[in-house]
Amino acid sequence: MNDKCVVLNAKKMNFDGKLDFSVLSSDVTVYDDTTEQQLSERIQGADIIVTKEMPVSAEMIQKFPESVKLICEAGTGYNNIDLEAARKKGITVCNIPSYSTERVAHTAIMMILNLSSAMQVQMKMLACGNHDNFTRNLQVPHVEVNGKTLGVIGAGHIGRKVIQIAQALDMNILVYTRTPKEDEKGICYVSLEELLKNSDYVSMHCPLTESTKHMINKETLSLMKPSAFIINTSRGALIDEAALIEALENGMIAGAGLDVQETEPPEETNPLYTMDQVLLTPHMGWKGLETRQRLVSILADNIKQFMEGNPINVVSGLSYLAK
């Protein structure tokens, strides 16, 4: 079967030019970027469309040719695609739920360890020529993580990997999730309010939906300990950024580790850039070459299984049997 596959914005995942997309289909066309004006011409006759965090609106989907059977989001999050519009047009949408599990979990743990030692502050001090910490007591917070409580919001693949590593660090675990499991050793399932009140570190690992947008806001931030840190390696809009900045400025919480932001990249004037208690990274959790190669491999399997009538990783649409 010679199925036409179009990759609309490959540069988003292939920024170093090292990925091979030929495994997706014997007939694959790859574009670095695609504007909405270019879309119609580029997807004519396409069976499969691949995107990476590119907005795919209802208006765009309505204009898709009838040949389109599958939209593949080349990542875990799929809030960029109008799922209802795809469903109405009979188009299946799939994602890649676990390609970056290890790497993103490592990023979250790295942030916890970094913030516990104010590593970014100490590096800045040395870079500015302040060598006092070599000869006298530390002038920044420096705490152990063992025995501290980690609150994990969302217990999917990444959340559970974070829990596994945190348990190896002898951290206590609180979890808030829609799907708790019974009798899990060392894990205590609690309400969001209880988690925020009792955690020394809070790590976000849930998808961005209408119900989770700004779930961390002025009200929920006020529940946290003044000594607590919040970590977000999931989606920026889970946290009301303005409320977070206010909480940090007023000392309501101790700090934040953010690999994702509401607007990426943040505006140049965003206070998060210059806050000593913030560890800000450029959505790097998924960007390692090994991780991206795994992404393409799973993406190819998604397409293969779908076209053989056994769709996997479906987030919306019909259990479409390819003809």
Walk through the language-model features, giving the residues of each.
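Short glycine-/small-residue-rich Rossmann-like dinucleotide-binding loops
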Residues: 54, 76, 200, 206-208, ...
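N-terminal glycine-/charge-rich "phosphate-binding" loop or analogous flexible N-terminal tail
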Residues: 1-48, 174, 307, 322-323
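Rossmann-like dinucleotide-binding domain for NAD(H)/NADP(H)
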Residues: 89, 93-94, 218, 227-323
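Rossmann-like dinucleotide/phosphate-binding beta-alpha-beta segment
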Residues: 23-24, 138-226
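Rossmann-fold NAD(P) dinucleotide-binding segment
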Residues: 55-68, 211-229
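Short beta->alpha connector loops at strand-helix junctions that form conserved
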Residues: 32, 74-75, 91-102, 177, ...
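Phosphate-binding beta-alpha-beta segment of Rossmann-like dinucleotide-binding domains, i.e.
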Residues: 97-149, 315
